[in-house]
């Protein structure tokens, strides 16, 4: 699937996943078994491995898990299926939810499956970046997460940071396909000239075009002990 190819190209030339892992690493217990929930193609799982004993990467997308399995390293296990149905035999020491799931759902899953800290990585902006018009991200934002945690009285720490995760392209046609794939606007599309105006010179002969994207993110850290048992229902 082309979306996976785009993602792997972006991961290969940016330190995005390494940057996220470096923010989480100091807060991980020693020799931890970490779950990367909604791992996608597993780039963050691989980036987390140097900082822990084992990473279990879970995603419901069979193609994403197949892609990860083709690039597995020692100490990373890939599992395909629904997060709630794939509970570990022993609770995880930590769980990471990177741009995955509604906050209420992650709290419920974590209370059942984790005995330590959970890390929620959320977008620190409100609108979709690759759409023609203004398309809201709704509840999948840092602001929404803060509202939920405050409402439930769950203590947390939060760290704001940025990580470059631009998209390289092999051709202008690839850039056009990218915007067609990720445009969430129901009525508007970007013209070829508008797409070209967003691009800069690429990093190499293989990728002559580049779409810059400095991603503003928030890292929420929560102790599962602070999540009430009612959240697990």
Language model feature labels by segment:
Residues 1-16:
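Class I SAM-dependent methyltransferase Rossmann-like catalytic core
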Residues 14-31:
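Conserved alpha-helix/loop element of class I SAM-dependent methyltransferases that forms part
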Residues 31-40:
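Conserved class I S-adenosyl-L-methionine
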Residues 41-82:
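Class I SAM-dependent methyltransferase SAM/SAH-binding core
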Residues 115-128:
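Conserved beta-strand signature within the Rossmann-like core of class I S-adenosyl-L-methionine
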Residues 138-153, 157-159:
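Short alpha-helix
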Residues 160-233:
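Conserved Class I S-adenosyl-L-methionine
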């Amino acid at each position: 699937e082309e979306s996976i190819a785009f993602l792997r190209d972006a991961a290969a030339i940016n330190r995005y996943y390494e940057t996220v892992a470096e923010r989480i690493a100091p807060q991980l217990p020693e020799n931890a078994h970490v779950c990367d929930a909604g791992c996608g193609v597993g780039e963050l799982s691989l980036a987390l491995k140097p900082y822990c004993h084992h990473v279990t990467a879970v995603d419901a997308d069979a193609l994403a898990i197949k892609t990860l399995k083709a690039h597995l390293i020692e100490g990373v296990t890939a599992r395909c299926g629904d997060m709630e149905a794939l509970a570990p035999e022993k609770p995880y020491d930590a769980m990471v939810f990177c741009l995955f799931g509604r906050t209420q759902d992650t709290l419920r899953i974590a209370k059942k499956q984790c005995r330590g800290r959970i890390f929620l990585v959320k977008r620190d902006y409100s609108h979709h970046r690759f759409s023609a018009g203004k398309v809201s991200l709704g509840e999948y934002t840092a602001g929404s997460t803060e509202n939920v945690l405050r409402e439930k009285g769950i203590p947390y720490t939060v760290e704001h940071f940025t990580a470059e995760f631009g998209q390289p392209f092999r051709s202008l046609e690839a850039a056009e396909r990218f915007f067609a794939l990720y445009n969430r606007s129901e009525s508007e599309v970007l013209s070829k000239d508008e797409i070209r105006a967003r691009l800069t010179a690429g990093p190499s002969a293989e990728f002559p075009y580049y779409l810059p994207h400095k991603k503003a993110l928030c890292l929420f850290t929560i102790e599962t002990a602070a999540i009430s048992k009612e959240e697990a229902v």
